[in-house]
Amino acid sequence: MTSRLRLPDRLLAIDRALADAGFEHAFGGAIALAYWTLDPRGTSDIDVNVFIPAARCEEALAALPEDIAWSEADVAAIKRDGQVRVWWEEIPVDLFFDYVELHADAARNRRTVPFEGVEIPILGPIELATFKAMFDRTRDWADIEAMLEAETLDAQAVRENLLALIGEGDRRVQRLDETVARA
């Protein structure tokens, strides 16, 4: 079935499906970033954190809109890695499940924001920036810098999260310090 829904409509369908099934969740990535930089950028994917243990991922996968394709290999990847990319036609949907304590913080600190005439949950700025630092991609560091420039980010809280996750010696901690110094 080809739905040709716009990306915002797909995001709202995922939000409704997870909420109707009783799963706490929050959108991350560029969607959340738009609220923390006050400067939206384009995106072609949907990032969603589902606040249940990775071991229970099949329950959440079954609740997603039926056009989102997933397999037993995806279930195995989630149980192993805590995350997976699945597809809704040509749109990637990145799913993240609880596998470290930071996810509990993300659930507690999520915010509700207006989106397309309704309210959706998004990651708070500290958790979003921490996840971005962990991914360690060039664009993620640019996003963190933009959050710092918008003055929506507590850089020390992000640093403390990184120290708890990866330790002082990891280069991502140093890169955060350098990014903060530049901003």
Predicted segment positions?
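Compositionally biased terminal segments of proteins
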Residues: 1-183
